[in-house]
Amino acid sequence: TPQIQKPAPQFSKTALLPDE
């Protein structure tokens, strides 16, 4: 489970860029 949480934050960062 901990491995899935690590890649999760990476996707959030990329999603914020396109949002702007």
From Swiss-Prot:
Q: Which domain of life is it from?
A: Eukaryota
Give me the ranges of the annotated region Disordered: 1-20
Q: What else is known?
A: On the 2D-gel the determined pI of this protein is: 6.5, its MW is: 24.1 kDa.
Please identify the protein, giving its name as recorded.
Unknown protein NF015 from 2D-PAGE
**Origin organism of this chain?**
Naegleria fowleri (Brain eating amoeba)
